[in-house]
Amino acid sequence: MEITFLGTSSGVPTRSRNVSSIALRLPQRAEIWLFDCGEGTQHQLLRSDLKSSQIRRIFITHMHGDHIFGLMGLLASIGLAGSAQDIDIYGPPGLGDYLRACAKYSYTNLANRVRVHAISPGILYEDEEFTVSCQLLKHRIPAHGYRIAEKDRPGRFDVEKANALGIPPGPIYGKLKKGETVTLPDGSKIRGQSLCGETEIGRKIAYCTDTIFCEGSIELAQNADVLIHEATFAHQDAGLAFESVHSTSTMAAQVALAAQVKLLLMTHFSPRYLPGNSLDISNLLEEARAIFPNTKLAYDFLTYEVPRNRQEMALGVK
């Protein structure tokens, strides 16, 4: 699970930050899941090592332009490139109407099938590896945060030990690898767990934007390995945060602390904190770390690989 920030600015792009979009790369299945798609996202993809042809799912938090204005252009470009892969899009009611209107009035025919799913709180996608759920956040319009939970996996299967027990290779190995109990031809029973190493704990990521401090964020982020949370304003600008229903850096840190996450990655910064102003984002980082020390600032093209088994986390840029 590899997170790449494609846009980290709030509202409008700046010279160094595009508007909201995050890519979650799943190398084991050659897929990319996109979270929000602000204007210019496809340009950011071209500047990265990510392949738009691998995008299989897109999750939209809410219908503000800085989170959706890049979506139709990206879908059109993927279609023009000849990709025949289906794309599933999840977002608020109205997202499907918006995309249909864009396609109609721009005379755009998508080569691939695009399915739009209107979301509501709860589990919205599940397969053998992952569960994705959402919760309502607190913003000026309906907005949802997302939680991506990888399922626990059995530890490494000990083939040598299985051979020593006289277990013949074949389909039975598959059952044992899953931790199941099997009966051998001689009637003896073997517990799969006894042949596997320690269970690999599934990794968890929460994405919360746009929102002010709320219980929905805490619920989504509970015990997450990584919480990606908006930090539009500094603490001293809390009045602006309440007025616009956005978070301060201290609110993001309070969510991380309450949810007992491992790492907080702050994003969605107001352009008012560009270098040269009385406050810049280093001040936001200082404020957040006073509450939740393991806090980092996201920036465009930051890549972070979520480690397995909740090992010590380290940032890496590609």
UniProtKB/Swiss-Prot annotation:
Binds 2 Zn(2+) ions. Zn(2+) 1 binds at H62, H64, H139, D210. Gene3D superfamilies: Ribonuclease Z/Hydroxyacylglutathione hydrolase-like. It holds the Pfam family Lactamase_B_2. Its cofactor is Zn(2+). Keywords: Endonuclease, Hydrolase, Metal-binding, Nuclease, tRNA processing, Zinc. Its EC number is 3.1.26.11. It comes from the Bacteria. The active site is at D66. It is an enzyme of class 3 (hydrolase). Zn(2+) 2 binds at D66, H67, D210, H268. Homodimer. Belongs to the RNase Z family. Zinc phosphodiesterase, which displays some tRNA 3'-processing endonuclease activity. Probably involved in tRNA maturation, by removing a 3'-trailer from precursor tRNA. This is Ribonuclease Z. It comes from Microcystis aeruginosa (strain NIES-843 / IAM M-2473). The gene is rnz.
